[in-house]
Structures are given as structure tokens and as C-alpha cells.
């Protein structure tokens, strides 16, 4: 459901440490970063984007526009914790500082259980020391034949329109290079447009579930909270629904339908400062939709599970505990391994409600890996798509006729990883330039 492009750090950090040592050894003078400039005036190309997509945005919409290299605010940020504000409205509207950030995320799994999509759209200064600015987009794709493709794109501007009937977000670099998402006020429909040199097309997501808070309460609720773990806020505008993907990636078709979902995160610090691990599952099997998110806090070492199950679009279960209880609803989440295999081949998810006297069990079998990255010291992450099967198990241990479907799952371990705090800028050739910028890397 969520990914930060940590593998980028696994490449840059060793290089940067070497550059730093060489600079110290030979007393090299280190230049400053040359910031990337947009291809044209944002006001001009934004108008072109509105016209291309026939976006009719009334003047009553609240417009929040930020640039990738805006100065860091020195005063306290406006950090929204309102439980009744539109989930997709900006939570840091006054700007970003060196730590706080927010993310809009979308994911999908094909009905075959073999293709998948994971999209993260960020306003986040966590990687500002790398130089390309505060607005990035990560996209991971896997085709039925196991081919994968990933990109991290840095944009020049971010504009979010909050209207009475929808929220529209535009991450752009020019009239020919942009991403646009639209989410309706009732969170029943989301659409993402892609228009870049590499990816063109659109993704539509139709919710079959109610928007929800970390505690499982349904939106809107004036008494619920958006905080999921210390300094981390998370809500689900679309816990699950039907997705229609119609993209072309470097002229290769990427088209399918299946399961999709949409998440929102915002936090007072970067993810590496706040979490050591996180797990995520989204599943659709027959009438059931399950969403599960569990971060483990670096602040106190505690895991914060949030499980939510619907049947025919109605909530039947939620839990914020991962421990067996005779009173409290809980989720058990365990890997399945074949004999003599070090890695799991799937997972089993068990949901138990002692108060209702009900239990649901779902088996998840991996079909394709969507991404994997290793960062050393046991740090890294993996995501899979696959087939799901399960349903309710009655008191006599006789399960209902099992339902079949698909899932997305993600595991990330960054316990041994931290973002460096001493930043040094070096200038040498490293990979392709970003939007025509000078070649540089920053630590």
C-alpha cells in the first residue's frame, strides 16, 4: 500500500561516503546544488493541463500551491488532525519543513493475481538532501509474465484543489509532464491521469467500501482520531474497490481490472525516523474486502495493527490488536513456508471477534513479486500480488463455502536504517539527469 524509494539510498550512501572521504583527504572544495527549474511558468502550464483534462474547477475551491524548492517555514506548521476534514485535502497546507510530510497512495491487483500497481504521490522533504526537491512520485508495476518496472519521478510543483464535491491534485513539471488525481467528496470514485514521456493513460478506482479511520470507525466521525502511531497519521478513503487500469508504459500496454484501494498518510517526521517495520495487506475474495496496515514505531517499539473487514460493502469486523484475547477483537498474521524454504510463499490471516463469537480465515498465496529492495544490515522490503481464498469459520469449525479472489501484500524492515543528518554536496556524474538538471548527488 505504501512505499518510499529506499533502494535509492542503498546506491547513493556508499558513493557519498566515499566522496566525503575523498573530499576530506584531498581538501576538495564542494559546490552547492543547482536546483531544477520547471520547463515554464507554472501558471501557464497548469492552465494547459486544466484544458487538456477538461477540469472545470469553480472559484469556490480552495487552492493550495507549493513549489519543489520553497523555503522551509521557520514558524510552526499548520498540521491538520481534524477527523471530519476531507481525507484527501492537504494536511500541511502552509508548506513543508525538514521533517513533516504527507502522501497520497493508490494500489491495485489484477483479477489474475499476477499484475499489480503501486503509486505513491508525495509532499515530503525527507530526501531533500538528495537535491531534486520535495515532490516525488514512485510507481511500481508488475505484469502477468513477472516483468517489473519502477520509477521515481521528481516534479516542480504541487497544486491541490479542495472543492465541495472533490479534491484534485496536480503534480507537474510542464504541460507535457504531469500526474493528476481526482477523488470525489464521498470517496466513491478516484481517477489518476498519467502524462509523462514514459507513462500515459489513466486509472479509475470505484469504492465498494466505506472510508474509515485507524480504529475502524467509519467516516465521518467527530470523535475518531487520525493518529495511527506516535506522530503518524493514516486514514483510508477507499479500503477496497474495483480498479480499471489503462496505461501505456514506454509503448507497452498495461491494461487490466481487479482490486484497488487508496490511503493517506501524514507525519511530523520522516518514515525512517518514525518506523522500524511496516506491513500492509489488501484483499478481495467474493463478498469480502480486507484492509490491514501495521506500522511498528521507532519511538516506543510498539506495533499498531489496524484491520478492517467488510462483506457486501458493510463493515463486519475491525481490530487494533494483534494479540489473542477473550474480550478484544484481534488479528493474527503469520507467514506460510514450504518445507526447507527460507522465505514464505504466502500468509494466513485470521480475524477473531470474541464478542460476536465469529472468526474469519484467509489464505494468501504469492503469484508475482511487485518489488524488492535490500539495504544491508537486514533492512529492505518486498511486495507481492497473488490469489486469496477464505471466509468465515463457524463455531463448529466448519467454514462457509470459501470465497476466492486476489490480494496485495507488503513487508518493509528499516530497523537498522536511518537517514544521515550530516549533509555534504558533491558534483560528479551519477545516472541520468533529472529534468535536465546538472549532474549531482547530495548526502
Curated annotation (Swiss-Prot):
GO molecular function, one term: isomerase activity
Glycosylation sites: 78, 97, 145
Enzyme class: isomerase
Signal peptide coordinates: 1-23
Induction: Expression is positively regulated by the oxaleimides biosynthesis cluster-specific transcription factor poxB.
UniProt-listed InterPro entries: DA_C
Keywords, ordered alphabetically: Glycoprotein, Isomerase, Signal
Pfam family, one: DA_C
Record's function text: Diels-Alderase; part of the gene cluster that mediates the biosynthesis of oxaleimides, cytotoxic compounds containing an unusual disubstituted succinimide moiety. The first step of the pathway is provided by the HR-PKS poxF that serves in a new mode of collaborative biosynthesis with the PKS-NRPS poxE, by providing the olefin containing amino acid substrate via the synthesis of an ACP-bound dec-4-enoate.
Family per similarity comment: Belongs to the Diels-Alderase family.
Descriptive protein name: Diels-Alderase poxQ
Organism encoding this protein: Penicillium oxalicum (strain 114-2 / CGMCC 5302) (Penicillium decumbens)
Gene name, Swiss-Prot/TrEMBL: poxQ
Amino acid at each position: 500500500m505504501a512505499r518510499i524509494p529506499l533502494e535509492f539510498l542503498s546506491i547513493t550512501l556508499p558513493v557519498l561516503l566515499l566522496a566525503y572521504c575523498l573530499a576530506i583527504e584531498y581538501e576538495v572544495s564542494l559546490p552547492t546544488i543547482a536546483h531544477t527549474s520547471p520547463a515554464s511558468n507554472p501558471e501557464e502550464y497548469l492552465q494547459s493541463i486544466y484544458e487538456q483534462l477538461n477540469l472545470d474547477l469553480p472559484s469556490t475551491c480552495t487552492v493550495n500551491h507549493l513549489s519543489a524548492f520553497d523555503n522551509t517555514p521557520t514558524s510552526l506548521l499548520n498540521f491538520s488532525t481534524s477527523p471530519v476534514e476531507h481525507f484527501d485535502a492537504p494536511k500541511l497546507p502552509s508548506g513543508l519543513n525538514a521533517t513533516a510530510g504527507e502522501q497520497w497512495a493508490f494500489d491495485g491487483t489484477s483479477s489474475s493475481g499476477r499484475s499489480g500497481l503501486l503509486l505513491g504521490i508525495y509532499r515530503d522533504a525527507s530526501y531533500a538532501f538528495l537535491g531534486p526537491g520535495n515532490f516525488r512520485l514512485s510507481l511500481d508495476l508488475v505484469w502477468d509474465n513477472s516483468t517489473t518496472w519502477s520509477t521515481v519521478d521528481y516534479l516542480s510543483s504541487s497544486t491541490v484543489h479542495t472543492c465541495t464535491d472533490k479534491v484534485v491534485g496536480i503534480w507537474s513539471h510542464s504541460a507535457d509532464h504531469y500526474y493528476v488525481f481526482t477523488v470525489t467528496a464521498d470517496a466513491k470514485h478516484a481517477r489518476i491521469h498519467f502524462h509523462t514521456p514514459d507513462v500515459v493513460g489513466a486509472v479509475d478506482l470505484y469504492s465498494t467500501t466505506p472510508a474509515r479511520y485507524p480504529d475502524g470507525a467509519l467516516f465521518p466521525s467527530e470523535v475518531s482520531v487520525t493518529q495511527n502511531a506516535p506522530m503518524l497519521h493514516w486514514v483510508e478513503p477507499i479500503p477496497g474497490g474495483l480498479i480499471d487500469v489503462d496505461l501505456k508504459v514506454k509503448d507497452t500496454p498495461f491494461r487490466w481490472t481487479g482490486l484497488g484501494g487508496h490511503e493517506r498518510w501524514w507525519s511530523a517526521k520522516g518514515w525512517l525516523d518514525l518506523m522500524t517495520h511496516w506491513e500492509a495487506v489488501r484483499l478481495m475474495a467474493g463478498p469480502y474486502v480486507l484492509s490491514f496496515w501495521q506500522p511498528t514505531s521507532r519511538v516506543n517499539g510498539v506495533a499498531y495493527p489496524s484491520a478492517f473487514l467488510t462483506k457486501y460493502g458493510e463493515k463486519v469486523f475491525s481490530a487494533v490488536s494483534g494479540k489473542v484475547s477473550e474480550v478484544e477483537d484481534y488479528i493474527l498474521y503469520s507467514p506460510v513456508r514450504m518445507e526447507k524454504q527460507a522465505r514464505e510463499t504466502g500468509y494466513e490471516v485470521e480475524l477473531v471477534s470474541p464478542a460476536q463469537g465469529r472468526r474469519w480465515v484467509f489464505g494468501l498465496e504469492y503469484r508475482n513479486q511487485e518489488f524488492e529492495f535490500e539495504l544491508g544490515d537486514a533492512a529492505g522490503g518486498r511486495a507481492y500480488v497473488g490469489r486469496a481464498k477464505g471466509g468465515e469459520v463457524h463455531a463448529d469449525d466448519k467454514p462457509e463455502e470459501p470465497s476466492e479472489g486476489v490480494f496485495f501484500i507488503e513487508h518493509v524492515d528499516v530497523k537498522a536504517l536511518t537517514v544521515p543528518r550530516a549533509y555534504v554536496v558533491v558534483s560528479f556524474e551519477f545516472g541520468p539527469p533529472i529534468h535536465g538538471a546538472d549532474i549531482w548527488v547530495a548526502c
